[in-house]
Structure formats: C-alpha cells, structure tokens
From Swiss-Prot:
GO CC annotations, alphabetized: cytoplasm; ribonucleoprotein complex; ribosome
Name of protein: Large ribosomal subunit protein bL36
MF terms (GO), sorted A to Z: structural constituent of ribosome
GO biological process terms held by the UniProt record: translation
Family membership: Belongs to the bacterial ribosomal protein bL36 family.
Coiled coil segments of this chain: none
S-adenosyl-L-methionine as UniProt keyword: no
Transmembrane segments: none
Lineage: Bacteria, Pseudomonadati, Pseudomonadota, Betaproteobacteria, Burkholderiales
UniProt KW keywords: Ribonucleoprotein, Ribosomal protein
InterPro entries in the record: Ribosomal_bL36, Ribosomal_bL36_sp
Length: 37
C-alpha cells in the first residue's frame, strides 16, 4: 500500500475508488495499491 498525495492509475487494471472520503487505487497487481492521505 503506497500512501501519496496524488494517486494515479499505473496500468489498465487500476481502478480509482472513493471509500469514506479516502481515494484509493485497487488493482490486480498488489504493488499498485495506493491510498491518498
């Protein structure tokens, strides 16, 4: 899980999702998981 100020899609499987006001990236590749914090 990478925590960064700006989250971007890395590959075409990445999806940007808002959960409880937190922007997240979920992907089939676990290294692409990100959270905006």
């Amino acid at each position: 899980m990478r925590v960064s100020a700006s989250v971007k899609k890395i590959c075409r499987n990445c999806k940007i999702i808002r959960r409880k006001g937190v922007v997240r990236v979920i992907c089939t590749d676990p290294r692409h998981k990100q959270r905006q914090g």
